[in-house]
A protein has these predicted regions:
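Catalytic center-proximal scaffold of phosphoryl-transfer enzymes
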Residues: 1-277, 281
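Compositionally biased, low-complexity segments
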Residues: 280, 290-292
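Short, intrinsically disordered C-terminal tails of secreted or membrane-associated proteins
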Residues: 297-300
Length: 301
């Protein structure tokens, strides 16, 4: 499963749009909070098992499941360090990390399955060597003075600030198994693009409209979007799906029995979906004064 979140404006305030998606299902919802409070309130990801692909947000790491980190994020950070912080002048470890990740991806794609243990060990050794080179060039800053000194104005309290390179290297070392999960576990992708794509259309909508004026409007929009995105993944005709809602014969998604999709802490299943979805779409059309297309005009679309 893939999970991600992005900021949106609802009722003039910052909210967070959360998504949980698979190859065949999409679920989106907005909440004022970004982390675990939103997961609990929305019923999102609380019981997820298997592998969860995400971008490394701390709240995701607290979930009791196997984790895989998005390497597109890592590559972007490594490119920045290589090009903007003059790392290429001194050592070149960041560029070599990028090349090693891409090489691993190519080998996994060519094999169509996790790599043999000997190749995994080779990549592990290369990764360890690059981490050591990077850490030699970007050592962690150590606290100077004592807490008593800080109270007297000497030194600073709390964790010492680190460079972007040092922070990235620490994360890549601490979560190295999650970085290389795509190489060791069957079917785990290299990136979290599936979740980011699920959020993209809603960001475009926000650029056009500016924000959602009410929480109810946001809930309505994301419910409809969840249904249509799911049916699109399952190769259904979306116009037929909408017609089926109004005809009270809703075309049902094919749900994976291992996955529960929840909305407002209520299970979104085959029993509750038709009426819930129909009422939601009707309210959306009424509130936005959308005029139905005459049947004679259907052929034009």
């Amino acid at each position: 499963m893939h999970a991600d979140e992005t900021g949106i404006r609802v009722e003039g305030k910052l909210h967070w749009l959360h998504c949980a998606v698979t190859d065949t299902l999409s679920w989106l919802a907005a909440h004022p909070k970004r982390g675990s409070q939103a997961f609990e309130a929305l019923g999102l990801l609380q019981g997820v098992k298997g592998v969860l692909v995400h971008d490394g947000l701390v709240s995701y790491k607290a979930l009791d499941c196997t984790h895989s980190l998005c390497n597109a994020h890592h590559i972007r950070e490594l490119v920045y360090i290589h090009e903007q912080e003059n790392e290429k002048i001194w050592d070149g470890w960041a560029q070599e990390m990028i090349e090693l990740l891409v090489q691993g991806l190519k080998e996994v794609d060519a094999a169509g399955k996790p790599l043999p243990l000997d190749r995994q060990a080779w990549f592990e050794a290369q990764w360890s060597a690059l981490l050591e080179r990077g850490e030699d060039s970007n050592p962690q800053n150590q606290r100077t003075g004592t807490s008593q000194d800080a109270g007297m104005g000497i030194g600073k309290r709390g964790r010492p600030s680190q460079s972007k390179a040092a922070n990235l290297l620490r994360r890549l070392r601490e979560h190295r198994q999650d970085v290389w999960r795509f190489m060791t576990d069957e079917g785990v992708p290299f990136t979290n693009n599936l979740a980011e794509q699920a959020l993209r259309m809603s960001k475009v909508k926000q650029k056009i409209s500016g924000c959602f004026r009410t929480a109810h409007g946001a809930h309505t929009f994301f419910t409809i979007r969840s249904y249509l995105a799911t049916m699109n993944k399952q190769k259904a005709n979306l116009f037929d799906c909408l017609l089926s809602v109004f005809n009270r014969q809703t075309i049902q998604p094919c749900f994976n029995p291992r996955l529960s999709i929840r909305t407002s802490s209520k299970l979104w299943d085959a029993d509750t979906l038709p009426k819930f979805l129909m009422d939601t779409i009707r309210n959306f059309l009424c509130n936005h004064r959308v005029t139905a297309i005459p049947r004679s005009e259907h052929a034009r679309f």
